[in-house]
Structure formats: C-alpha cells, structure tokens
Amino acid sequence: MLENSTAVHGVRLSDSPEDPFLRKRLASNTQLNQKKIRFTENENDLSPERAQKEPVSIPHGRYTWSTSPDTDSSHLPSTPPTVDIPFHHPHTIHSPTFTLSVSPDSQSSSATHQNDYISSPHADFSFSPPASKIQSHEPLNDMAAVHPLRPSHVSGPLSPPEPKAASVDHSINPAYNASFRLPDGPLWTEGSENLPSLDIQLQLAHIYFIYAHGQPYVLFHRDSFMEALKSQRLPPVLVLAMCAVAIRFWQTDKYDKNELFEQWFNRASAIAMANFDKLDLVYVASFVMLSYVCAATSKYWMFAGMAIRMVVALHPNKTPNLPYYDRPDSPLPFEIRVQLTRRLFWDCFMLDRLNSLYCNTQFLNLEDIHVPLPMRETLFMYKAHAVTETLTGKPSSPDSFTNANPTTAPIVSRNAQDNMGMLAYMIRMVSIWGRVVRCLKSYSQKQSNPYPFWHAKSTFKQLDQELYEWEKNLPNRLRYSRQTLLSYHMMGQGGQFACLHLIFLQIHLYVHRYAASISSVPFSHVKSPPTVFENQSAVLASQCANAICRIIQDCTELSISLAAPFTASSAYLAGTVLLYHYITRGSEVQASKAAVHLPIAKRHLAQLSVYWPALGMYAKALDAIAFHQGALVTPSVPPVIATVSKTNTTNTGVQQRGNVGVTTTGSILTQSSPALPVQPVPLAYSKPAPTTKSSLTELAYNTNVSLPPRSPGTGSLAAGNLPNEKAPSLMTMVNGGPVPGDIGEASIPVVQNLQPSTAHVDPESDLGRVIKICDWYQSPSSDVLLSKPLQLNSSEEMEQQCIDLSRHNTLLNLSSYGI
C-alpha cells in the first residue's frame, strides 16, 4: 500500500520526550535518505551499525499526511488522507500517531507520475504516542481481524494508499496469450459457421440451465456465461456442445431436432478431438458436455476419459487462475476463475466415478487429489472467496490462492464447513459411490476375499461407516424435506438438491437390494449373509426405494426438472424392490406403498428414455422382470395400474397425488403408452402469477396427500366395476387404465406368493445388460435366473460378526421423505 510511488522520499523521524518505545530522542533534522532504522524496545539494538544494515520497520499506528508552508499544493490532494496501520505493544493499548510531512526538497522526476496520489518526492515522518488517558479507538483483540494486511517493513519510497479494487488481477495467466487464444485464433473462430442464430442460442442456454446445470455437473457461472453469450464472445465449440445438450429438452415443432443434434454434436466433437493436444478448460468443458449427451454408451467413456486427462494435465491444484471462456481484454474475476477451475476438475471426478458402474474402471486416484471442494453456490454467484475442506475433510489453506492475487475478496467465514454447499457434499457422496462399486464388484470378479462384505472386518465396513458419518454430519440446511426442496427450487437449485439425496439413497439401495428384489442367483463365492443382516438389509432397501420414488414425485409436483442420467439407475433399483414387495405381498404395508410408488419409477424411466435413448434399457429391463413374473398374478384378478397424480382445482389449483386404478388386460408395467407426456415445465419462480409461490408452499408443506388403497370389497374396482371414464390429467400415468373417479376406491388384488422362476435371460438383451451393471452379486459367467436368492441358515457366531445396519434405519429420517 505504501510502495506504489516511484519517487524517492526523504523521511524524518521524531518522538515526544515521553516516548516509551524508542527510549531515546533522535535529532529532528536527521535525514534518513539512505539509512534504514529498525524500531525496537531495546535502545541497545538501535546502534548505528545495525541501523545501516537492517531494514526499517515502521511502528503500527495512525499516519496523517501534512504539508509544510512552502510545499507546492498542486501536487497534493485536497483532503489529506489518513492511513491506519494496526499497532500492538505489550505495555499499552493506545495507538500512536505518525505524521508524514511533505517537503519540496525535490520535484517529480517524470511526467508519468502526475496521476500519483502524491507527486512530491519528500516526506517528513514524525511519531507521537497517544495520551495515557485516551483509550484506543478499537479493541486489541480485533486488530488482526480489522487490519488483515499489515505492512511489516518499508523498503524504498513511501506513497499514500490508493483505493483497492475488489477483484482486479495484477497479472494475467500466460495461458491467455496462447496462439490459439489470440483474438482471431481457432478457439474463437472454429465452428462459428455451424452456430444457430443468437435467439436460438439464448433459448437453448435457458433450457440448459433448467434441465442440465447442476445435475450434477456445474460448468458455468450463469451470469457471466449469459452475458458473454449475448455479446457473442464465447468459443463456438463451447456453444455447440451446450446446444447439443439442451436440444434434447427443447420442445419445438419448427425444426428437426435430430438433424440439428447430429450437426452440432458431430461438429463439436470433431473440433474438440482435433484440439485435444491444446490443454484448455474450454475443451475440458466441451468433453464433459459431450459425455453427458452420450450417457450409458461407449462414447461416454471415451469423452469422459479425454476430459479427465486434460484437466489433470492442467494441474488445477497449482494453477487456480486458468483461462476459460473469457478473453485477456475482459478476464473473469479471480474468484470466479478459481471456482470454475475447481468445479471443472470435480465434474471430471464425478464423471469418472459415475461411469465406473458401466466400465468398472476408475482413473483418478484419491491420493493424488488435493483440490479444495467448491464453495456454496450463493457465495459463488456473489464472487466471494471462501475456505473449504478437501475431499479427506481437512480445511484447505487459503494461502495458495490469496497469495496468487493479493486483491482478492475477503474470506467470508473461517469455518470451512459453513462455506460448503450441496455440490461439495455431492462430490463426497459420489466418491463413496465409486469406492462402493469397486469394493462390491470385486466379490464377483475375484475368486478369493478374506471376509464377505457383511463381515465386520471386511473392506465394506469402512465404507458403511463413511455413509453413516455423511448422513450424521449433513447440515440441517441440506437435509431433505418438501419445504427445503421448494426453497432451493426458488433459487434454481431444486434439481441439484434432489440429485444429492438420490445419490445417497442409491448407494444404500445398490448394496442391500439383494435382500428385497427379484433378481439373479448370487455368485457362489459370495457367502450368504446372516439372517439378522439380511432382514436389516431388506428393511433398508425398502425404505430407500420408497424414498427415491417420493423425491421423484415431489420434483414432478413442484415442477422441478430431474433429468440427470444417473437417476435412471436409481429408479430401476427402486422399481425392482417395489415390484418384489408388490408380487410377494410379504407385508400389506409394503405392498400398498409399492402399488403407489412403482408407477412413479416407471414413469421416470420412460421420461428419461426420451431424453437419453440409451437409458431405455432400464425401462425395458423393469418391464421384462414384470413379464417373467406375470404368470404369478391370479388371472381372474386384474393387476394394479397406478395414476401418478390427479388435478384438484377446487381450492388452490395445485396438483394432488392420486391413487391407484386398474385395468382388465395386460400385466403390471408391461403396457406403456407411446404418447407419454414429457413436456418441459418452467421453473416456478419464473411465472408472473402472484399465487404461484403460495400454492407451491402449501403443496410443499402437504406431506400426507397420498392415501393407501383400501381393502377390496363389494363394488370395488377389484371386482371389475369400473367408474365412468374421465379425461386424464397431464400427470396421469397412461398405460391402459382409466383415471379412478374417487380417491381411495382402488384396491390391490390378492396374488400368490413368489416362486423361483426358471426363466433364463438372454445376456445380450436389455435385462441381461442391466443385471450385469446393477447386480454386483451376480457372476458374469453364470446363468441368469430370475429368482429370490436363497439364504443359508446362519449361526449365532456369524450374526455377531456381521455389520450392524440398524443405525442406518434409525438415522434415516423417513418422515422427511414423506414415508
């Protein structure tokens, strides 16, 4: 702050007779142009020999600029500034005052200094301690907090302070000057001939931020991205990749979406692959979006691998201010660049872990990751700087980033956990997901393991403990409830909040689904768990399956788009558990919930298959399981068909959950209407109607809108007496059955108990592929039979050695999910 001027100043030091710090008086006219004096309490340390060798250390206090009578006032400001420098001394809490007097001993040496705060090159430096009766103007304990930047020494000329900008970089990363980043370089020109009109770009960008942003990847800072898009200053390859993602959700009849998608996708992938040797965040983000489009395909693995290797080569933990979609003449603020660099790295990390379900391979090693987790979205949008934790839970050091730019914004909170949002907790959960997949699939890929997965000494024990700690330490602001979901939806983060809890529930369901699902025979090398562990697994899997469907239904009712590809596996895993409870009818309560929630999972899978055609294998696999078990349903009793919701406009006009209906033909979930409505829904806060928020708030607080079906009786729908047909609502699950006329009149038919099916599954079919992906306990080489795994009788010793899952059932607050 005091070293900005290039003029040479003369400094004169003086003190009062009562000076308790220097303990001696200096000559008032001593010129110290070439001398350097170090202030100390011991006068013996102030020897002339040491004074000439040691640097000067200006005492902390209040500095006031004053002029002598013969000073040229044209070089001085109208109002003398005052510089506050914190002061601390063990004998007093009073702040001394230093007066800097400008003298006209010399003139400015160059005209380039005419804009300096003070142009006169000489200043007198006088010191006077405060009176003993005057109290300090600020507490001693708050000195460091109020004055975080304290000059410890002055080497060279002195100058008054200048106003500090909030986010101004003193230096630009040399990567901005790369040849391909020049104003007319290929980064800004290649692919521009394939861009649609600006109006279409803006529409697709708006759709992208509704459907894809934060589910789970966060690639852009929305305000700066939209501003650059409107001014047409974005790299064309980035815009093409964004348009290829957004057009999947664009509902229009004016254009051929398939043709536009192929054109934009092929051009963006060609540009990105041709420039894979140019390490830049633009190409990393392009590969991430291209892999997002190719979910559950071989290209997904290829594009994700390119993005992972490029972002690792950029060293995001060492270079925080990498260039992105900004230019050297208008760079993004330092805080935004730091967070975007972190977010792109963690996006690649989540790509790697989520893809491990399909390819069984993970490239990033946890021991090599030292990048701090992203901060909260609200802090990110307001360009704040915050300290967060690392993936291992240790607080990150702010020195590496604050030292890179000393003018960075002040740290918001010293508590790292307060600065972490849902994206940081989602990254931790995805990390656990990747290790769970690797751990459990090793049981079917390796011939020997020291302990089975349910054993207290197994490798899964540590992962189970991490799951428990994650749920236990989750902040209240991130715990699920319908009202919290609505609150985040009003901030544009509803889909991201739902994805956070879907990943958590999916991990539990992936592990414990073996105990409550119709699936294949377990691998012979995996020892069957004890009865106690199996029962706890069945309860936990059933709870998570119902909770997943309730989250999906809450998003539907609150008009929250939930289009993340990984949610297809969540809905499929939940559907298999619900189908098992519906067919076996081991519990009337579970069967009733399954009848309500099973069509929700089916509808979500059908909707995702429209957005991502490759994910249609999950919907077909669930239909195939129901088809193989369809013979178990009593022919005289029609199977259950459910309606997802029913519109009630008598009071508030909000949607209420409907009940179950029936059809007289076909098996459950085997009939699916090709005209399934998958219309895009706008964000609730974008509607101008004043009653929108209040209506959604009432709906969010209404957690008991779903009624269980009544038992069959005379005149019920189970007897075949259908009500008068009504026009189905937009949210009705249309699969051959009419909309019930009265809530609560549908019933669940009586079905036989489940018997092991001898139906073989073609490994090349959709069901065979899904079983290999989702059933970790299935041997890849064994025959696939649809049956309930037969458990062995466990001994008391085995039950004492198994993992206790009851803590999960206790900690999992099912009431928050509306169950």
Curated annotation (Swiss-Prot):
<dbReference type="InterPro" id="IPR050815">
    <property type="entry name" value="TF_fung"/>
</dbReference>
<keyword id="KW-0805">Transcription regulation</keyword>
<dbReference type="GO" id="GO:0005634">
    <property type="term" value="C:nucleus"/>
</dbReference>
<protein>
    <recommendedName>
        <fullName>Uncharacterized transcriptional regulatory protein C530.11c</fullName>
    </recommendedName>
</protein>
<feature type="region of interest" description="Disordered">
    <location>
        <begin position="96"/>
        <end position="134"/>
    </location>
</feature>
<keyword id="KW-0238">DNA-binding</keyword>
<keyword id="KW-0804">Transcription</keyword>
<dbReference type="GO" id="GO:0000981">
    <property type="term" value="F:DNA-binding transcription factor activity, RNA polymerase II-specific"/>
</dbReference>
<dbReference type="InterPro" id="IPR007219">
    <property type="entry name" value="Transcription_factor_dom_fun"/>
</dbReference>
<keyword id="KW-0862">Zinc</keyword>
<feature type="modified residue" description="Phosphoserine">
    <location>
        <position position="16"/>
    </location>
</feature>
<dbReference type="GO" id="GO:0006357">
    <property type="term" value="P:regulation of transcription by RNA polymerase II"/>
</dbReference>
<feature type="compositionally biased region" description="Polar residues">
    <location>
        <begin position="96"/>
        <end position="118"/>
    </location>
</feature>
<feature type="DNA-binding region" description="Zn(2)-C6 fungal-type">
    <location>
        <begin position="36"/>
        <end position="63"/>
    </location>
</feature>
<dbReference type="GO" id="GO:0006351">
    <property type="term" value="P:DNA-templated transcription"/>
</dbReference>
<keyword id="KW-0597">Phosphoprotein</keyword>
<keyword id="KW-0479">Metal-binding</keyword>
<dbReference type="GO" id="GO:0008270">
    <property type="term" value="F:zinc ion binding"/>
</dbReference>
<keyword id="KW-0539">Nucleus</keyword>
<dbReference type="GO" id="GO:0000978">
    <property type="term" value="F:RNA polymerase II cis-regulatory region sequence-specific DNA binding"/>
</dbReference>
<dbReference type="Pfam" id="PF04082">
    <property type="entry name" value="Fungal_trans"/>
</dbReference>
<feature type="region of interest" description="Disordered">
    <location>
        <begin position="28"/>
        <end position="83"/>
    </location>
</feature>
<feature type="compositionally biased region" description="Polar residues">
    <location>
        <begin position="64"/>
        <end position="77"/>
    </location>
</feature>
